[in-house]
């Protein structure tokens, strides 16, 4: 019984037959029964498979990589009560974004349907704020109003067990308050609210204008 309890503290499992190696997040037996949906292999940043167990260990299980897999690339979805670990293409994309941001370079990530866009967006927005001290706010900008509630609920479900706050903006006034409150945080808002704030609400020379103008912000769109 004690041995079974010990496994309750494990967040990531690795299985291998030496020639093929996979990893997956700790899950209930019923979830694991679905098999391939929860088990994934590793690929390098050029998308070449890393199958050999020693090569996998060098790429994923060394320090600090193993720590980062848990601290930076694991999500506890509070709504679904499920532990999730990002897939390698998501991790490589976020790492590339972080490296580019440190050099003040913009970029984009290609995503297909069902590839985990929301979770990638959450972790990218979250990690930029956590890893780069000079960034005061990260803003996840949505281009359609109908996605606002959906994205906000997903982000807040991920953040419930995280070390970061996610604030939504129900209107332009709320957006201005979030931007001027002095807290380091992630903000979820729409392009329409941001445009309205810039074009109609902010007036040059006011305290709000000066504070927002001088903010160091990273946008994830």
Question: How would you label these PLM feature ranges?
Answer:
Residues 145, 166-177, 190-196:
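Conserved helicase motor
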Residues 1-137, 146, 150-161, 182-185:
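ATP-dependent helicase/translocase motor core
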Residues 140, 187-189, 219:
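Hydrophobic positions in the central parallel beta-sheet of the AAA+
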Residues 171-187, 210-211:
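Conserved motor-coupling elements within RecA-like helicase/translocase cores
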Residues 197-201:
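Conserved ATPase-coupling elements of RecA-like P-loop NTPase cores
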Residues 2-3, 192-195, 218:
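Conserved RecA-like P-loop NTPase helicase motor core
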Residues 207-221:
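SF2 helicase catalytic motif II
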Residues 16-17, 142, 221:
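Short beta-strand/turn micro-motifs composed of small residues
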């Amino acid at each position: 019984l004690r041995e079974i309890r010990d496994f309750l503290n494990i967040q990531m499992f690795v299985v291998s037959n030496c020639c093929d190696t996979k990893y997956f997040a700790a899950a209930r037996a019923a979830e694991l029964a679905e098999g391939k949906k929860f088990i994934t292999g590793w690929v390098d940043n050029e998308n070449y498979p890393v199958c050999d167990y020693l090569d996998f260990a060098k790429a994923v299980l060394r320090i600090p990589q193993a720590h980062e897999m848990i601290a930076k690339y694991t999500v506890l979805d509070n709504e679904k009560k499920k532990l999730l670990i990002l897939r390698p293409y998501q991790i490589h994309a976020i790492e590339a974004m972080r490296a580019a941001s440190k050099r003040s370079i913009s970029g984009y990530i290609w995503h297909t349907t069902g590839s985990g866009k929301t979770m990638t967006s959450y972790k990218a927005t979250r990690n930029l704020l956590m890893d780069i001290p000079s960034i005061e706010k990260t803003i996840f900008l949505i281009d359609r109003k109908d996605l606002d509630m959906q994205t906000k609920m997903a982000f807040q479900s991920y953040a419930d067990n995280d070390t970061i706050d996610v604030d939504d903006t129900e209107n332009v006034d709320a957006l201005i308050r979030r931007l001027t409150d002095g807290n380091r945080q992630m903000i979820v808002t729409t392009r329409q609210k941001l445009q309205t704030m810039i074009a109609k609400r902010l007036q040059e020379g006011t305290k709000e204008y000066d504070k927002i103008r001088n903010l160091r912000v990273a946008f994830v769109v």
